[in-house]
Amino acid sequence: YKMQSSIIILVIILYFLGLFIVSNLTIGNNDNSTFFSANKESPWYLVAFGMVGASLSGITFISVPGDVGTTQFTYFQVVLGYLFGYFVVALLLLPIYYKLNLTSIYEYLKIRFGSVSHKTGAFFFFISRITGACFRLYLVAIVLQQFVFNELNIPFEITVLISVLLIWIYTFRGGIKTIVWTDTLQTTFMLISVLLSIYLISKSLEWSFMDFINSDELKSYSNIFVTESFLDKNHFFKSFIGGMFITICMTGLDQDMMQKNLTCKSLKEAQKNMIIFSIVLVIVTFLFLLLGALLFIYSSKFNIVTPELNGAVNSDLLFPEIALNSGLGNLIGITFLLGLIAAAYSSADSALTSLTTSYCVDFADLKDKSNDYQIKIRKRTHIIMSLVLVIVIIIFKNYLTTSVIDGLLILAGYTYGPLLGLFAFGILTNYKIHDKFVWIVTSLSVIVMIFIGSLDPQFLGGYKIGYELLPLNGLLTFIGLILIRRK
């Protein structure tokens, strides 16, 4: 049994029609303040709900359930760290951004240190955001390719091109204002999808939800805490601290995530949004872990083979395999597809908008130019960013092997580290620095980190570096900045 491609394509078309309708209803006027900050009128609960979708990109949707087979529920340790990190963002960073009334959060670095720091910060955001958004879209494009477009003989490149084109169409007028709304829609699809999948798979195993929670099969997957050996990559302390810093950087120091928060009416609303969002996120991630366990129980019971990609077994493809090809009916297939597409696009569309915003505000210095000129540059940037995404994804397809979640988090460790160092130094100390040397300090800390990250664990006495790469990298930058401070 397989779902027919025609049904799948119909679902995709209907989904995007829905998005276009929403984007037309929210368009308002075409000016840059709508595109960049939604005229600061977004209702906080919409932002909070939509952010869940953007954080739980396609990666969470496929890789988190897929990783349960090897790491069980240990990812939840990282998630608890996230929760703590969100409190830091809400109580420490948001007040600063609101007080300075920023459009791009990297303007803080310009105010605090100077323009080289500003450009350096924005540059690191650029690299991490482009690769991050491409990772997410790449993952989904591969699933769509493998389960739909191969049968129609449509090459991968075309799949990607169409994907990005669709995003471009519904964001190029409304920008962030549209995205706050479309993300809400996308989060809804994602939640329905995970809940329905849990329900339908339990049903086919003839379990109620409580049967599943109490089952012996679940016990073999539900180990959360790793506290035995500190050398272990997934040790609780390392995962928790790592998770906390991942949030502080990948949310708090990230234009993409903060841009939605800065569209709220006031600091109080933005903080409320952040706290509620973090609690919802923890619950939702736990649902994804439960789903993961369920998928593995189901596949071992019915002998479903995990598909391969480039000759290696790829756990990321287990969920799509079960949803689309295991005879559970069209409903689960359709909800899976909607959830997956929603997950991927809700992070990619905001990435496209935030990259455009960052370029216009941080590099092109548009604030002093005439309004028409600003809009022209913004539109041109938007098109170029879209093309960059397409090219990078096609490069990924030809050169990538590891499981996607690892790749993304390792990469984040290298590119968000300097941002962590710069912001921490700015907030925690009062020193001025020799601005022109900033790029040397940040580049060096990244190079040193890449070297440390590639060391064999035997050198470090069996110590495996995990998620704590990021805080270490930030610390290096921090120390470097102390060295170039003005006496």
Locations of the language-model features?
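Membrane-embedded helix-loop-helix hairpins and adjacent transmembrane boundary segments
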Residues: 3-487
